[in-house]
Amino acid sequence: MSQCVDGIKHLCTSVLGCFDLDLYKQSGGLGDPELLARDTVFSVSEIEALYELFKKISSAVIDDGLINKEEFQLALFKTNKKESLFADRVFDLFDTKHNGILGFEEFARALSVFHPNAPIDDKIHFSFQLYDLKQQGFIERQEVKQMVVATLAESGMNLKDTVIEDIIDKTFEEADTKHDGKIDKEEWRSLVLRHPSLLKNMTLQYLKDITTTFPSFVFHSQVEDT
């Protein structure tokens, strides 16, 4: 998760990317910031400032108003590796329309879960989905191992397989209270509530300061925060 957090922070300063999506021109733009503000924890001002960030990323190569996986990986993880399980998983969770590209609404709604004011249950749900690779509603041992290995690879760490297996053993020993060889949503929630530090990387304090980071919206804002 630390790789995800570092990458999201890097979004504020990185506008790298290389792709061509001429067939998917988007004209919606910012849309209704008040509606997005009601549906997320962002204020209207934060939504408009977040849109400035989105435009910088999505127009890095062509001004198409969209972000694809390659551009997302370059901005988020500073890598253009074709195979990155961790980066792919994070992108897939952002890409709620499952069309291989991100529009602003998806971008804003996904980042909302990392806001300091986001409900803890939203953070727990997102972190659960991150490990539920097969989307079966529970986490299997192999899925945990795949994500651990992928995360270590992204951070440049190399642990012996025996050490990794030991980490997984201890995780399941505590989390799998039903002793069925898997971790369901209820068990994951209980584990996280016992160990809140597991969610420490699900909160990005800088999102509260997004209007300071990208203040240009101030000059053309159409609505006021309530």
From Swiss-Prot:
Induction remarks: By light.
Lipidation (S-palmitoyl cysteine): 4, 12, 18
Impact upon substituting residue 12 to S: Decreased tonoplast targeting. Loss of tonoplast targeting. Loss of tonoplast targeting
UniProt-reported outcome of changing residue 18 to S: Loss of tonoplast targeting. Loss of tonoplast targeting. Loss of tonoplast targeting
Outcome reported for the amino acid change (mutating residue 106 to A): No effect on binding to CIPK14
PTM section of the record: S-acylated in vivo by PAT10. The ratio of acylation by either palmitate or stearate between Cys-4, Cys-12 and Cys-18 is unknown.
Annotated EF-hand domain residues: 36-81, 82-117, 119-154, 163-198
Involved in dimerization, annotated site positions: 155
Any GO MF annotation of the entry: calcium ion binding
Alphabetically ordered keywords of this record: Lipoprotein, Membrane, Palmitate, Phosphoprotein, Repeat, Vacuole
SUPFAM superfamilies linked to this entry: EF-hand
Tissues expressing this chain: Ubiquitous. Stronger expression in aerial parts. Expressed in guard cells, meristems and elongation zones of roots, mesophyll cells of leaves, cortex and pith of inflorescence stems and anthers and stamen filaments in flowers.
Gene null: resulting phenotype: No visible phenotype when grown under normal conditions; due to partial redundancy with CLB3. Chlorotic symptoms under low-K(+) stress. Clb2 and cbl3 double mutants show stunted growth, reduced fertility and necrotic lesions at leaf tips. They have also a reduced vacuolar H(+)-ATPase activity, are hypersensitive to excessive metal ions and are more tolerant to low-K(+) conditions.
Pfam families given in the database record: EF-hand_5, EF-hand_8
Membrane-protein topology: Lipid-anchor
Assigned protein family: Belongs to the calcineurin regulatory subunit family.
UniProt remark on domains: EF-hands 1 and 4 have been shown to bind calcium. It is not known if EF-hands 2 and 3 are capable of calcium-binding. The N-terminal 22 amino acids are necessary and sufficient for vacuolar membrane targeting.
Subunit structure: Homodimer. Part of a K(+)-channel calcium-sensing kinase/phosphatase complex composed by a calcium sensor CBL (CBL1, CBL2, CBL3 or CBL9), a kinase CIPK (CIPK6, CIPK16 or CIPK23), a phosphatase PP2C (AIP1) and a K(+)-channel (AKT1). Interacts with PP2CA, CIPK1, CIPK2, CIPK4, CIPK6, CIPK7, CIPK9, CIPK11, CIPK12, CIPK13, CIPK14/SR1, CIPK16, CIPK23, and CIPK24.
Name of the protein described by the UniProt record: Calcineurin B-like protein 2
The species this protein was found in: Arabidopsis thaliana (Mouse-ear cress)
Lineage start: Eukaryota, Viridiplantae, Streptophyta, Embryophyta, Tracheophyta
